[in-house]
């Protein structure tokens, strides 16, 4: 610690040369290594600390407590003089001879603060937290920038109502779709119906595992108070169902592309047995690719910055479920549309089959409905986490609701495009309603068949 002798009209400057000098000014030498690091950090980011604390930005601390403003020139130099004079009496005598005694005395009184009578019954302010201090003051703590509360669920009960309606309407509709497609696949033995049946089965699994078990049971009923092993095992089934649904749609896309662009090869290669084997291979691959997501972290509970494993799993999910499938959809659908336009320019009628129209509708619907979820997931990973920003929390809730809508929207698309599907659905409903009607009629009132086998004449004997 050094004192520079200057003329009387200039100020005495004091330059700290080590952490010991700073702790000496603060009035104690018993600082731990953690406190030294805090002092060093405060020395580097003084402006940042002042900008984050309304308490330090106030003009003064009222109520008889210490004045903690950062004072330029006179007061701060006097404060430094007083501490130096206490350590060096010789320097004190020398300064008195130069006429600086009044300045040092004022600074010394400022260092000691108000008198005991003036400060009786008033709270004291600690400049830096020490190991013996229980915590920061309440006013300081309320403006501490590093502490952030968990973001509230702004949507409230709307997701619960939405998923309940989606499950109550979507699951019966999906079961009806599966029965109708099973009849069409058995009757026609066309590969496209087998692929649509497998796609519907995957949507049913998504509704049961994700919508019912995930959002409603774990989220709403149990409030996420579920054993971690159960949650992680459910993650495998959820991601496997998502992968199966998307990649079966890719099989349908490739089948339609081959049927339109390479019809001879499609007729020679397509068969019900080969179609079933392709579906079984995709389902097995989907289950295997869902196993790594056992370590998937819930974004509502993920309070730390994403680790390497988290980033790998989130990027794998985005690539497997959205980016790669959308790339395949874009290429194959563009080739199909280009083929149909060429037929129109050559004078032939560009006939668009029902399966092709259903394919274009399914892929377009999937691309639009899943885009918000993927965007919010990447935003959560690199910009703002869900648990800190209520807007990201709300965006993730809405994105999940929109993404789950595709599991029930396919039925309306099938009915809108295909007259054969509508007729099959009516037949399924009629067949299910007729036994219930016959069972509800009294005994002896059942309708007789229109055509009766011929019997023996009355009075005739065998």
UniProtKB/Swiss-Prot annotation:
Residues 87-123 are annotated as: Disordered. The chain crosses the membrane at residues 153-173, 196-216, 234-254, 279-299, 317-337, 358-378, 398-418. SUPFAM superfamilies: Family A G protein-coupled receptor-like. Its main location: membrane. Keywords: Cell membrane, G-protein coupled receptor, Membrane, Receptor, Transducer, Transmembrane, Transmembrane helix. Pfam families: 7tm_1. It is a multi-pass membrane protein. Exclusively expressed in the central nervous system, most abundantly in the ventrolateral region of caudate putamen, the habenular nucleus, the zona incerta, and the medial mammillary nucleus. Residues 1-152, 217-233, 300-316, 379-397 are extracellular. GO terms for biological process: G protein-coupled receptor signaling pathway. GO terms for cellular component: cell junction; cytosol; plasma membrane. InterPro entries: GPCR_Rhodpsn (IPR000276), GPCR_Rhodpsn_7TM (IPR017452), Orphan_GPCR1 (IPR052477). GO terms for molecular function: G protein-coupled receptor activity. Residues 106-115 have a biased composition (Basic and acidic residues). It is found in: Cell membrane. Residues 174-195, 255-278, 338-357, 419-462 are cytoplasmic. Belongs to the G-protein coupled receptor 1 family. Orphan receptor. This is Probable G-protein coupled receptor 142.
């Amino acid at each position: 610690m050094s004192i520079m002798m200057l003329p009387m009209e200039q100020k005495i400057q004091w330059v700290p040369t080590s952490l010991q000098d700073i702790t000496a000014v603060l009035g104690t030498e018993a600082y731990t290594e953690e406190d030294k690091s805090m002092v060093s950090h405060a020395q580097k980011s003084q402006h940042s600390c002042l900008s984050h604390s309304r308490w330090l930005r106030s003009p003064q601390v009222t109520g008889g407590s210490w004045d903690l403003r950062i004072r330029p020139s006179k007061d701060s130099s006097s404060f430094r003089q007083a501490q130096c004079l206490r350590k060096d009496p010789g320097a004190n005598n020398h300064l008195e001879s130069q006429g600086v005694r009044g300045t040092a005395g004022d600074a010394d009184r400022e260092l000691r603060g108000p008198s005991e009578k003036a400060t009786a019954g008033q709270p004291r302010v600690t400049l830096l937290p020490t190991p013996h201090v229980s915590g920061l003051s309440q006013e300081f703590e309320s403006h501490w920038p590093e502490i952030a509360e968990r973001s509230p669920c702004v949507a409230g009960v709307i997701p619960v109502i939405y998923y309940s309606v989606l499950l109550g309407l979507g699951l019966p509709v999906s079961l009806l779709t599966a029965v109708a497609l099973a009849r069409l696949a058995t009757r026609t033995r066309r590969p496209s119906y087998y692929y649509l049946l497998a796609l519907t089965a995957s949507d049913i699994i998504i509704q049961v595992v994700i919508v019912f078990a995930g959002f409603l049971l774990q989220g709403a009923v149990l409030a996420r108070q579920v054993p971690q092993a159960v949650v992680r095992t459910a993650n495998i089934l959820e991601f496997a169902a998502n992968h199966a649904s998307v990649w079966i749609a890719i099989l349908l896309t490739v089948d339609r592309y081959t049927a339109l662009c390479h019809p001879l090869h499609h007729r020679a290669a397509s068969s019900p047995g080969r179609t079933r084997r392709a579906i079984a291979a995709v389902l097995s691959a989907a289950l295997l690719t869902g196993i790594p997501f056992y370590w998937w972290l819930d974004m509502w509970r993920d309070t730390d910055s994403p680790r390497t494993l988290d980033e790998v799993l989130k990027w794998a999910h985005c690539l497997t479920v959205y980016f790669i499938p959308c790339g395949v959809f874009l290429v194959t659908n563009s080739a199909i549309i280009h083929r149909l336009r060429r037929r129109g320019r050559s004078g032939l009628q560009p006939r668009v089959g029902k399966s092709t129209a259903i394919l274009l509708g399914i892929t377009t619907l999937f691309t639009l409905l899943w885009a918000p979820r993927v965007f919010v997931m990447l935003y959560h990973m690199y910009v703002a986490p869900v648990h800190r920003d209520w807007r990201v929390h709300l965006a993730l809730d809405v994105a999940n609701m929109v993404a789950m809508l595709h599991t029930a929207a396919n039925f309306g698309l099938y009915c809108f495009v295909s007259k054969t599907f509508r007729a099959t659905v009516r037949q399924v409903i009629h067949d299910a309603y007729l036994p219930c009607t016959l069972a509800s009629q009294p005994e002896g009132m059942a309708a007789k068949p229109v055509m009766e086998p011929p019997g023996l004449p009355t009075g005739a004997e065998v």
